[in-house]
């Protein structure tokens, strides 16, 4: 059998400031402040997933948007 792990060793570290995230309310962050700061980074474009740039389409309505317009009468 494996040895039991001390609960303080299982406690994850805050994804933002690396303190122990004790309260489960804001997990994986230690506080609302860290959670909000991380959200702000996402909203400002601070985190970017690498990959090919997406092409902008000329038709903003999407595919098939104009198909049913002629048969409406």
Curated annotation (Swiss-Prot):
Give me the ranges of the annotated region Disordered. 54-73
Where do the annotations place Zn(2+) binding? Answer: 14, 17, 30, 34
- Which cofactors is this protein said to need? Zn(2+)
Free-text cofactor note: Binds 1 zinc ion.
Could you tell me one molecular function GO term of this UniProt entry? DNA topoisomerase type II (double strand cut, ATP-hydrolyzing) inhibitor activity
Keyword annotations of the record = Metal-binding, Zinc
The Gene Ontology biological process annotation of the record reads:
regulation of DNA-templated transcription
Q: Which InterPro entries match?
A: DNA_gyrase_inhibitor_YacG (IPR005584), Znf_NHR/GATA (IPR013088)
One of its Pfam families is YacG
Known function: Inhibits all the catalytic activities of DNA gyrase by preventing its interaction with DNA. Acts by binding directly to the C-terminal domain of GyrB, which probably disrupts DNA binding by the gyrase.
Q: Which HAMAP family match?
A: DNA_gyrase_inhibitor_YacG
The entry assigns this protein to a family as follows: Belongs to the DNA gyrase inhibitor YacG family.
Q: How does it assemble?
A: Interacts with GyrB.
Q: What is this protein called?
A: DNA gyrase inhibitor YacG
Q: Which organism is it from?
A: Hyphomonas neptunium (strain ATCC 15444)
